[in-house]
Protein backbone atom coordinates (compact mmCIF):
# COMPACT_ATOMS: atom_id res chain seq x y z
CA UNK A 1 0.00 0.00 0.00
CA UNK A 2 2.93 2.33 -0.33
CA UNK A 3 2.56 3.57 -3.89
CA UNK A 4 -0.01 5.72 -5.65
CA UNK A 5 -1.04 3.22 -8.32
CA UNK A 6 -4.47 1.61 -8.17
CA UNK A 7 -5.73 4.35 -5.86
CA UNK A 8 -8.51 6.77 -6.71
CA UNK A 9 -8.94 10.13 -4.99
CA UNK A 10 -12.59 10.45 -3.93
CA UNK A 11 -12.32 13.56 -1.78
CA UNK A 12 -10.18 15.85 0.32
CA UNK A 13 -10.27 16.85 3.95
CA UNK A 14 -11.03 20.49 4.65
CA UNK A 15 -10.88 22.50 7.85
CA UNK A 16 -11.74 21.20 11.31
CA UNK A 17 -15.40 21.55 12.24
CA UNK A 18 -16.13 22.44 15.85
CA UNK A 19 -13.96 21.42 18.81
CA UNK A 20 -14.70 17.68 19.08
CA UNK A 21 -12.46 16.40 16.30
CA UNK A 22 -14.81 16.68 13.34
CA UNK A 23 -13.37 17.62 9.95
CA UNK A 24 -15.03 18.88 6.78
CA UNK A 25 -14.95 16.50 3.81
CA UNK A 26 -14.93 17.80 0.24
CA UNK A 27 -16.35 15.02 -1.91
CA UNK A 28 -15.21 14.52 -5.50
CA UNK A 29 -17.99 12.01 -6.16
CA UNK A 30 -21.16 12.80 -8.06
CA UNK A 31 -23.48 13.23 -6.33
CA UNK A 32 -21.38 14.39 -3.38
CA UNK A 33 -22.95 12.00 -0.88
CA UNK A 34 -21.77 9.01 -2.94
CA UNK A 35 -18.59 9.31 -0.90
CA UNK A 36 -20.58 7.62 1.88
CA UNK A 37 -20.59 4.39 -0.17
CA UNK A 38 -16.90 3.94 0.61
CA UNK A 39 -15.87 3.13 4.15
CA UNK A 40 -12.28 2.03 3.55
CA UNK A 41 -10.73 5.50 3.40
CA UNK A 42 -6.99 6.10 3.22
CA UNK A 43 -4.78 9.21 3.19
CA UNK A 44 -1.41 9.55 1.48
CA UNK A 45 0.90 10.42 4.35
CA UNK A 46 4.64 9.83 4.79
CA UNK A 47 4.91 8.51 1.21
CA UNK A 48 2.34 5.77 1.65
CA UNK A 49 -1.39 5.20 1.82
CA UNK A 50 -2.53 4.85 5.41
CA UNK A 51 -5.96 3.60 6.48
CA UNK A 52 -8.37 5.74 8.48
CA UNK A 53 -11.19 4.46 10.63
CA UNK A 54 -14.35 6.53 10.33
CA UNK A 55 -16.14 6.93 13.65
CA UNK A 56 -18.93 9.17 12.39
CA UNK A 57 -19.83 10.78 9.09
CA UNK A 58 -22.71 13.20 8.67
CA UNK A 59 -24.23 14.98 5.71
CA UNK A 60 -25.31 18.43 6.76
CA UNK A 61 -27.21 20.91 4.60
CA UNK A 62 -24.04 22.49 3.24
CA UNK A 63 -21.26 20.14 4.27
CA UNK A 64 -20.13 16.61 4.93
CA UNK A 65 -18.30 16.21 8.22
CA UNK A 66 -16.48 13.22 9.65
CA UNK A 67 -14.89 12.11 12.87
CA UNK A 68 -11.79 9.95 12.49
CA UNK A 69 -10.37 7.53 15.06
CA UNK A 70 -7.17 8.89 16.60
CA UNK A 71 -8.12 12.52 15.99
CA UNK A 72 -10.36 13.41 18.96
CA UNK A 73 -9.62 17.14 19.08
CA UNK A 74 -9.65 20.08 16.69
CA UNK A 75 -5.90 20.57 17.06
CA UNK A 76 -5.20 16.96 16.04
CA UNK A 77 -7.68 16.70 13.18
CA UNK A 78 -6.27 19.88 11.62
CA UNK A 79 -3.33 17.71 10.48
CA UNK A 80 -5.71 16.12 7.95
CA UNK A 81 -6.56 19.44 6.28
CA UNK A 82 -5.91 19.33 2.51
CA UNK A 83 -5.04 15.62 2.50
CA UNK A 84 -6.62 13.58 -0.28
CA UNK A 85 -8.96 10.72 0.59
CA UNK A 86 -8.32 7.64 -1.50
CA UNK A 87 -9.83 4.21 -2.03
CA UNK A 88 -8.61 1.20 -3.96
CA UNK A 89 -9.70 1.29 -7.59
CA UNK A 90 -11.24 -2.16 -7.10
CA UNK A 91 -13.87 -0.61 -4.78
CA UNK A 92 -15.38 1.44 -7.61
CA UNK A 93 -18.53 0.21 -9.29
CA UNK A 94 -18.07 -1.36 -12.71
CA UNK A 95 -19.14 0.87 -15.58
CA UNK A 96 -20.85 0.02 -18.84
CA UNK A 97 -18.69 -0.03 -21.98
CA UNK A 98 -18.01 3.52 -23.15
CA UNK A 99 -18.44 5.00 -19.66
CA UNK A 100 -15.49 6.38 -17.73
CA UNK A 101 -14.65 7.77 -14.34
CA UNK A 102 -13.16 11.25 -14.54
CA UNK A 103 -9.80 10.11 -13.19
CA UNK A 104 -9.50 7.78 -16.21
CA UNK A 105 -9.81 10.69 -18.66
CA UNK A 106 -7.50 13.13 -16.86
CA UNK A 107 -4.04 13.02 -18.40
CA UNK A 108 -5.22 11.67 -21.76
CA UNK A 109 -4.08 13.42 -24.94
CA UNK A 110 -6.80 15.04 -27.05
CA UNK A 111 -6.68 15.13 -30.85
CA UNK A 112 -9.22 15.88 -33.55
CA UNK A 113 -9.96 13.70 -36.58
CA UNK A 114 -7.35 15.67 -38.58
CA UNK A 115 -4.70 14.60 -36.08
CA UNK A 116 -4.23 18.07 -34.53
CA UNK A 117 -3.01 17.76 -30.94
CA UNK A 118 -4.92 19.97 -28.50
CA UNK A 119 -2.99 18.92 -25.39
CA UNK A 120 -3.89 16.87 -22.33
CA UNK A 121 -7.01 16.75 -20.19
CA UNK A 122 -6.10 18.48 -16.92
CA UNK A 123 -9.56 18.79 -15.40
CA UNK A 124 -13.20 18.03 -16.02
CA UNK A 125 -15.73 20.71 -15.13
CA UNK A 126 -19.32 19.88 -14.31
CA UNK A 127 -21.62 22.49 -15.84
CA UNK A 128 -25.03 21.08 -15.04
CA UNK A 129 -26.01 20.21 -18.59
CA UNK A 130 -22.84 18.29 -19.46
CA UNK A 131 -19.25 17.90 -18.33
CA UNK A 132 -16.51 19.88 -20.05
CA UNK A 133 -12.97 18.64 -20.74
CA UNK A 134 -10.37 21.25 -19.80
CA UNK A 135 -7.48 20.62 -22.18
CA UNK A 136 -4.11 22.34 -21.75
CA UNK A 137 -1.68 22.56 -24.65
CA UNK A 138 -0.33 25.53 -26.55
CA UNK A 139 -3.58 27.13 -25.51
CA UNK A 140 -6.46 26.12 -23.27
CA UNK A 141 -9.48 24.42 -24.82
CA UNK A 142 -12.86 23.77 -23.23
CA UNK A 143 -14.52 20.86 -25.03
CA UNK A 144 -17.98 19.55 -24.07
CA UNK A 145 -17.77 15.89 -23.08
CA UNK A 146 -20.61 14.67 -25.27
CA UNK A 147 -19.83 11.20 -26.67
CA UNK A 148 -21.25 10.76 -30.15
CA UNK A 149 -21.45 14.50 -30.67
CA UNK A 150 -18.05 16.05 -29.88
CA UNK A 151 -16.20 13.05 -28.42
CA UNK A 152 -15.68 10.56 -31.24
CA UNK A 153 -13.52 7.97 -29.46
CA UNK A 154 -11.77 7.27 -26.18
CA UNK A 155 -8.80 4.94 -26.62
CA UNK A 156 -7.78 3.79 -23.16
CA UNK A 157 -4.80 1.75 -24.35
CA UNK A 158 -3.30 4.70 -26.27
CA UNK A 159 -4.55 7.27 -23.72
CA UNK A 160 -6.07 9.39 -26.51
CA UNK A 161 -9.45 11.07 -26.85
CA UNK A 162 -10.48 11.93 -30.42
CA UNK A 163 -12.87 14.86 -30.73
CA UNK A 164 -14.87 16.59 -33.44
CA UNK A 165 -13.62 20.06 -32.55
CA UNK A 166 -11.82 22.83 -34.38
CA UNK A 167 -8.41 23.97 -33.10
CA UNK A 168 -9.56 27.60 -33.35
CA UNK A 169 -12.44 27.25 -30.87
Curated annotation (Swiss-Prot):
GO molecular function, one term: ribosome binding
Keyword rRNA processing tagged: yes
GO biological process, alphabetically ordered: ribosomal small subunit biogenesis; rRNA processing
Keyword annotations: Chaperone, Cytoplasm, Ribosome biogenesis, rRNA processing
GO cellular component, one term: cytoplasm
One Pfam family from the record: RimM
Matches recorded under SUPFAM superfamilies: PRC-barrel domain, Translation proteins
NCBIfam families for the chain: 16S_RimM
Family stated for the protein in its record: Belongs to the RimM family.
Protein name: Ribosome maturation factor RimM
Species, as recorded: Legionella pneumophila subsp. pneumophila (strain Philadelphia 1 / ATCC 33152 / DSM 7513)
